[in-house]
């Protein structure tokens, strides 16, 4: 049986634990309310305290990450760095890579246009692409070399002009129609080759294609333009990269 002094200490410790639990819960709600008041279009997915710091990592439903004080009065948009024995470690980049890696693992090859590696597969890269993008075409010309090096290229659709061409959402953009026509073709690889080489493809929109889902996924990944290469690790490599340089980055 605890003596009165020990009972008092235990009670005090329990009260402190309850206080901090409530404080952490209320911090997330406080941050959510602050976001809603300042920018209603910014919706909080979750808020997690940065280990040992009076700072919260705020993940939005869009996939973007902010940092906030517990009272929700100050927000920082950008990367958070941790100074340690490794130098300056980009905490935000690591967090984003981890999120993208989980999403990449859930992708289905049947929903993409896949150019399989020749011989032993040494790596897989996922590329958000648009038919009307000059650097996307330049990267596509590197695909045979990438395949020779043992790298499988999996294309996801990212129409830079968006899906709809009008406010009433009744007309599709040209880039959307071209990409969907590739996905609806019986031979997606040949259709992609033709579209990349000429910029033209016979219109075929009579199928269920994941174009809009890919566009949404790209936004969650932080894609801001095309091409955008996502490695198996979740790392995002924006823009064009020559085949041999990409292989070197992959350790091949």
Could you tell me what each predicted segment is?
Residues 1-9:
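Bacterial N-terminal signal peptides that target proteins for export
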Residues 121-206, 219-224, 252:
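Structural alpha/beta surface segment adjacent to cysteine/selenocysteine redox centers
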Residues 41-48, 54-60, 64-67, 71-88, ...:
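Thiol/selenol-based redox catalytic cores and closely related redox-interacting motifs
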Residues 9-18:
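Bacterial N-terminal signal peptides
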Residues 93-96:
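Extended, non-globular interaction scaffolds
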Residues 28, 32, 140-143, 176-179, ...:
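Extracytoplasmic/secreted envelope proteins and their assembly/folding machinery
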Residues 23-43:
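Short, non-transmembrane alpha-helical segments in secretory-pathway proteins
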Residues 105-123:
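A short beta-strand-turn-helix
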């Amino acid at each position: 049986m605890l003596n009165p002094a020990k009972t008092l200490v235990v009670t005090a410790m329990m009260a402190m634990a309850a206080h901090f639990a409530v404080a952490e819960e209320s911090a997330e709600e406080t941050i959510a309310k602050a976001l809603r008041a300042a920018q209603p279009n910014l919706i909080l997915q979750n808020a997690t305290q940065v280990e040992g710091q009076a700072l919260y990592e705020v993940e939005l439903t869009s996939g973007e990450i902010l940092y906030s004080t517990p009272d929700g009065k100050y927000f920082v948009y950008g990367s958070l760095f941790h100074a340690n024995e490794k130098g300056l470690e980009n905490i935000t980049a690591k967090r984003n890579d981890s999120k993208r890696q989980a999403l990449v693992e859930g992708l289905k090859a049947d929903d993409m246009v896949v150019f399989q590696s020749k011989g032993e597969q040494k790596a897989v890269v996922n590329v958000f692409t648009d038919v009307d993008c000059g650097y996307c075409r330049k990267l596509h010309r590197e695909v045979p070399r990438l395949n020779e090096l043992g790298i499988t290229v999996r294309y996801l659709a990212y129409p830079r002009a968006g899906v709809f061409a009008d406010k009433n959402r009744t007309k599709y953009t040209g880039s959307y129609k071209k990409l969907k026509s590739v996905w609806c073709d019986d031979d997606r690889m040949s259709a992609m080759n033709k579209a990349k080489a000429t910029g033209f493809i016979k219109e075929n929109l009579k199928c269920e294609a994941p174009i809009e889902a890919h566009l949404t996924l790209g936004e969650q990944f932080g894609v801001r333009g095309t091409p955008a290469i996502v490695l198996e690790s979740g790392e995002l490599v924006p823009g064009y990269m020559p085949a041999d340089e990409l292989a070197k980055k992959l350790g091949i």
